[in-house]
């Protein structure tokens, strides 16, 4: 995308005719839960969670093709009907011609302003959109200006379709769930309170009200309303050419109640005459609440345009304060771009993987990796509280080295997985150590290693391969000892269990098993024989890093030993002959897992820091040397790189094959980061990556070469383009 220009040092930018760029949208959210997407034409959606969508859910394709978006119309007496968003049949017919309206989008952190000017209608419209930090409501401040030389008489109407239910109902029971709608008009707008909510949780009594209310800048209320889609668009009409707008039709009055129809927040204001250069404004509020009083309070809080602008400034200041990192280079555009890069982790925390049009993976919530990524971002921009966040996150580790995969809404809250056999991502044990090391490197807080945290417990045991038949919900979600006391261990102990259990869980080539996938979720079809050499590198690097932290801890504290779970001694056998044997390593792992299937002994042992450090280094060095010796591949021209994976037939994935060269980026990155790759190997990897993965058209390196097949013995990623 080209053409945007930064306006200040806080990332504010503007872009002319932004609607001519396909799939463009902007995130606007608050901290109370409402999260929205806005296109330049005010398309997009708004929701609190998967089951609570204010506006109809959209994917990337819907951004271009949906008709029912947020809109604000002016019926101009004697001329026609003009959409301030550009979302009208008339304006769309002018697209890519000289008759197209002049338009511009200006935006900053969590706010957007669209400006549109029509030669035909001699009007300029400005729509400022944002969400207050502490409220679940979108605020639109609409300003209409007469740019002509003569007085203009216009009738303004806000028109926002209210979806008001779960995203599941976009196809499943779409019509049936509209029958649940109970629509009511008040003196300021339209309220929709469905009787029930239909979603994967079953049929539940609904307590949410979805609404659109508004008034003019001087407090004038709408004269009437268009509360249903069928009355608004009319017979044969649609949201781009609605009957009610074209005919300036009379709506229903306040106090009207309607059941069982699709709803629209249609607010029909009184006719107003604007002299040349005169302007008028309207305040539109679209939101979700469980308390009707919150809607009434809006008319008391935001009585004027000035009150809305005051709220906007508070909102801007709040989000700018979150990004307290500044960049100073010779390129001012790069500095401002990096301001947005710094804001991205905040957007990721709010939206997750599920709630933006191009990020529609799953149904919301955060995953295990997200917990640690949040810590990394906060360490740079808001370090207060990171220590406690780390401690709380470690409580999601199971005693078998795996971890909870269902994350609660509160910090340190984890939910039991009730599936018989759960999916295990083999990379999950990597990230806590990487985050902890970064935290200690930044703060020098080596004492964190001796702080204690609980262990998560549910019926999943033996790293997701068996279930604990003795566990039920009365046991609770915290690991206990045989004495019924909650088991707690140091952060060091948690790190050791995650990385040591992974070290022993190997496939037939003595690399760590791929299991359900690694950080590439799409490598998900090799759970029996798949191995991730890429993340074996990462674990090898972690073992070396733990040893380094232990040395620094000993030097700082003067302590000679650390207290660890007695059962962990099984995993601390230090014998090259053991490391060379897949069978013996799996036996050690099984022996350990058997000792803590239900409860732990509750016993602790003192381990020499010096011996533990030596032990970890031996394991790390063995694993790195094993990879150097067995996983280095070459093409016919002697270009070399590391194989990163084994498929579900136990075959090496990368190399110079009969169907061509196969190379993946992940294994190269982690072999270099961990220290597995020698200086000479790094040079060869770089040369090979430049040869096989670099693509100037995409501006960088691809994740892999084209394998030329849908490789169903490794993962669904090979079905993607």
Where are these regions (language model features)?
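Long, low-complexity segments enriched in small/aliphatic residues
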Residues: 621-626, 630
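Conserved active-site and cofactor/substrate-binding residues in soluble primary-metabolism enzymes
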Residues: 369, 534-537, 541, 618, ...
């Amino acid at each position: 995308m080209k053409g945007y220009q930064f306006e200040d040092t806080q990332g504010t930018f503007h872009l002319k005719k932004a609607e001519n760029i396909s799939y463009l949208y902007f995130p606007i959210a608050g901290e109370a839960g409402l999260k929205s997407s806005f296109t330049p034409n005010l398309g997009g959606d708004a929701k609190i969670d998967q089951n609570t969508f204010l506006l109809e859910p959209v994917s990337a394709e819907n951004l271009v093709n949906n008709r029912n978006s947020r809109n604000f119309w002016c019926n101009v007496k004697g001329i026609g009907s003009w959409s301030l968003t550009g979302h009208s049949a008339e304006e769309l017919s002018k697209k890519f011609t000289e008759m197209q309206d002049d338009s511009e989008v200006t935006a900053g952190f969590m706010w957007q302003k669209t400006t549109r000017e029509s030669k035909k209608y001699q009007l300029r419209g400005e729509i400022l959109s944002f969400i207050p930090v502490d409220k679940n409501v979108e605020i639109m401040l609409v300003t209409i200006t007469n740019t002509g030389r003569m007085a203009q008489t216009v009738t303004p109407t806000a028109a926002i379709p209210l979806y008001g239910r779960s995203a599941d109902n976009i196809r499943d029971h779409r019509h049936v769930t509209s029958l649940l709608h109970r629509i009511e008009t008040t003196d300021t707008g339209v309220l929709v309170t469905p009787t029930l909510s239909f979603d994967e949780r079953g049929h539940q009594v609904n307590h949410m009200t979805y609404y659109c209310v508004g008034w003019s800048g001087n407090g004038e209320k709408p004269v009437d309303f268009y509360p249903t889609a069928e009355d608004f668009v009319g017979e044969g009409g649609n949201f781009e050419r609605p009957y009610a707008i074209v005919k300036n039709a009379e709506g229903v009055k306040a106090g009207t109640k309607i059941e069982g129809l699709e709803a629209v927040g249609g607010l029909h204001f009184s006719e107003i005459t604007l002299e040349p250069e005169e302007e008028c404004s309207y305040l539109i509020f679209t939101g979700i609440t469980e308390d009707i009083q919150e809607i009434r309070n809006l008319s008391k809080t935001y009585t004027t345009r000035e009150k809305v602008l005051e709220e906007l400034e508070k909102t801007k200041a709040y989000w700018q304060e979150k990004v307290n990192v500044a960049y100073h280079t010779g390129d001012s555009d790069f500095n401002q771009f990096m301001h947005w890069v710094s804001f991205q982790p905040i957007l990721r925390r709010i939206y997750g993987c599920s709630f933006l049009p191009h990020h529609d993976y799953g149904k919301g919530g955060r995953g295990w990796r997200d917990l640690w990524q949040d810590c990394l971002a906060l360490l740079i921009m808001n370090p207060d509280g990171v220590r406690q966040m780390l401690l709380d996150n470690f409580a999601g580790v199971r005693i078998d080295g795996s971890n909870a995969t269902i994350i609660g809404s509160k910090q340190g809250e984890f939910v039991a997985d009730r599936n018989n056999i759960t999916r295990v991502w083999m990379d999950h044990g990597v990230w806590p150590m990487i985050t902890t090391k970064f935290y200690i490197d930044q703060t020098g807080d080596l004492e964190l290693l001796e702080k204690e945290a609980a262990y998560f417990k549910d019926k999943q045991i033996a790293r997701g391969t068996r279930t604990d038949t003795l566990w039920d919900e009365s046991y609770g979600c915290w690991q206990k000892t045989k004495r019924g006391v909650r088991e707690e261990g140091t952060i060091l102990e948690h790190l050791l269990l995650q990385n040591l259990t992974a070290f022993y869980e190997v496939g037939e080539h003595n690399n760590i098993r791929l299991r359900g996938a690694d950080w590439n979720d799409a490598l998900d079809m090799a759970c029996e024989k798949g191995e991730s050499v890429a993340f074996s590198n990462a674990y090898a690097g972690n073992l070396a890093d733990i040893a380094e932290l232990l040395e620094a801890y000993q030097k700082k504290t003067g302590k000679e030993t650390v207290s660890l779970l007695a059962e962990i001694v099984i995993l601390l056998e230090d014998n090259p002959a053991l490391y060379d044997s897949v069978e013996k390593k799996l036996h050690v792992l099984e022996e350990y897992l058997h000792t803590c299937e239900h409860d732990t002994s509750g016993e602790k042992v003192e381990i020499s820091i010096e011996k533990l450090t030596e032990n970890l280094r031996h394991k790390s060095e063995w694993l790195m040397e094993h990879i150097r010796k067995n996983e280095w591949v070459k093409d016919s021209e002697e270009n070399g790189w590391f194989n990163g994976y084994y498929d579900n037939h136990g075959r090496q994935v990368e190399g110079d094959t009969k169907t061509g060269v196969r190379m993946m980026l992940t294994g190269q990155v982690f072999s270099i980061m961990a220290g597995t790759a020698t200086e000479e190997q790094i040079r060869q990897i770089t040369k090979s990556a430049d040869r096989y993965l670099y693509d100037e058209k995409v501006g960088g390196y691809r994740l892999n070469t084209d394998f030329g097949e849908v490789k169903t013995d490794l993962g669904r990623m090979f079905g993607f383009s």
